Every structure is written in structure tokens, then in C-alpha cells.
């Protein structure tokens, strides 16, 4: 495994660990999810260029589009939760609460 692949795998693993550890605040969870998506984007682009699979060259762009949509929905949810509750705790996302 080359050092670039190892660094990207470590970055993805650290972002995943951040999602699992810092899941009390929505903003920190969203930042860790963005780190995961960016490391996946770079890994996918490098693998496509390394193996010369140019028929799948649009896959990283599609992943980036879905990542931007996820960020937009997450920030809209963050604004709505902070307007309603005054904080960004993930426990406020429970829809079964009255």
C-alpha cells in the first residue's frame, strides 16, 4: 500500500472515529462526515486514474454532488434545530419526543 493510500485510509478512519466519538453535537458530526466524503472522493479519483478506468470517471463528481447535497440538508437541519431548541444536540433529533 502506497503512502498516499495509507494516508487517505487513515484520514477516513479518523473521520469515522470522529463520527462515533463526537456524536453529541450535530455540527461536529457533519464536519466528520464531510471529512469522510472528501477522503472517499480523493481515493476514488486516484484509483480511477491509477487503473485507467476512464469509463467510470464521473463517479467522483457524482460523489461530490451527493456530498454537497448532504451538507446542504445537514446545515438546514442544524439551523432548524438551533432555532427551535437553542442548541445543536443530536438527541433533539428524536422524532418520537413530544
Swiss-Prot record:
Core subunit of the mitochondrial membrane respiratory chain NADH dehydrogenase (Complex I) which catalyzes electron transfer from NADH through the respiratory chain, using ubiquinone as an electron acceptor. Part of the enzyme membrane arm which is embedded in the lipid bilayer and involved in proton translocation. It is found in: Mitochondrion membrane. Its EC number is 7.1.1.2. GO terms for molecular function: NADH dehydrogenase (ubiquinone) activity. This is NADH-ubiquinone oxidoreductase chain 4L. Belongs to the complex I subunit 4L family. Its main location: mitochondrion. It is an enzyme of class 7 (translocase). GO terms for biological process: ATP synthesis coupled electron transport. Pfam families: Oxidored_q2. It comes from Phalanger vestitus. It is a multi-pass membrane protein. Keywords: Electron transport, Membrane, Mitochondrion, NAD, Respiratory chain, Translocase, Transmembrane, Transmembrane helix, Transport, Ubiquinone.
Amino acid at each position: 500500500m502506497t503512502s498516499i493510500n495509507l494516508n487517505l485510509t487513515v484520514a477516513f478512519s479518523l473521520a469515522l472515529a470522529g463520527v462515533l466519538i463526537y456524536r453529541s453535537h450535530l455540527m461536529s458530526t457533519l464536519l466528520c462526515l464531510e471529512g469522510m466524503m472528501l477522503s472517499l472522493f480523493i481515493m476514488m479519483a486516484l484509483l480511477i486514474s491509477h487503473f485507467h478506468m476512464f469509463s467510470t470517471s464521473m463517479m467522483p463528481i457524482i460523489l461530490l454532488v451527493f456530498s454537497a447535497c448532504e451538507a446542504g440538508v445537514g446545515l438546514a437541519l442544524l439551523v432548524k434545530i438551533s432555532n427551535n431548541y437553542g442548541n445543536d444536540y443530536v438527541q433533539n433529533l428524536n422524532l418520537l419526543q413530544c
